[in-house]
A protein has these predicted regions:
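Glycan-processing catalytic domains of CAZymes
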Residues: 1-166
Length: 166
């Protein structure tokens, strides 16, 4: 895992585009770990960011289905922002519990909740009742200041889901 050149390019871009706030380590808690990504890699990314563009934060995608992976808390500890996603729509009923679990372990870390409009875990349309539950729960968590933001993964192949969320 080599990030030096990418972070050099990011440092140049971030000077011209102050809206760039962070880097996102997508699929960190699943594919990344499977390919050998370790907490020390996050530390190295943060060190390089501190040298070249210190205002840029390190965000990492953590899937709730990966909570039981060995050392997952060590990965989350190294992040500046935890981007929490529920892969299987059937598990959105546990969204509040999952946020509180992360909040208890890392009370100082910002958490943003990722919201899918598609059930990637089952490879199907997101059932509307679960979409509404997911969005309603996330909004309540945001209003209650348990999370700091929401991220929608948008799609354009399910008109009903898109229309409901707009």
């Amino acid at each position: 895992f080599e990030y030096r050149e990418t972070i050099k390019r990011l440092a140049l871009l971030s000077g011209d585009y102050p809206a760039i706030e962070g880097v996102l380590l997508d699929d960190m808690s699943s594919i990344g770990i499977d390919k050998g990504f370790r907490p020390e890699h996050i530390r190295e990314i943060r060190r390089l960011l501190d040298e070249g563009c210190p205002r840029i934060k390190t965000w990492g995608v953590v899937y709730t289905m990966n909570f039981n992976r060995p050392d997952i808390n060590e990965y989350m500890r190294e992040l500046d922002v935890i981007s929490l996603w529920t892969w299987h729509a059937r598990d959105v009923v546990n969204l509040e519990q999952n946020v509180l679990r992360v909040r208890e372990s890392f009370p100082e870390k910002p958490i943003v909740v990722g919201l899918y409009l598609y059930d990637y875990g089952e490879g199907r349309r997101m059932p509307m009742d679960l979409l509404k539950l997911q969005c309603g729960t996330a909004l309540a968590l945001l209003e209650g200041k348990q999370i700091q933001g929401l991220v929608f993964l948008t799609i354009d192949n399910d008109a009903e889901a898109v229309e409901w969320t707009t």
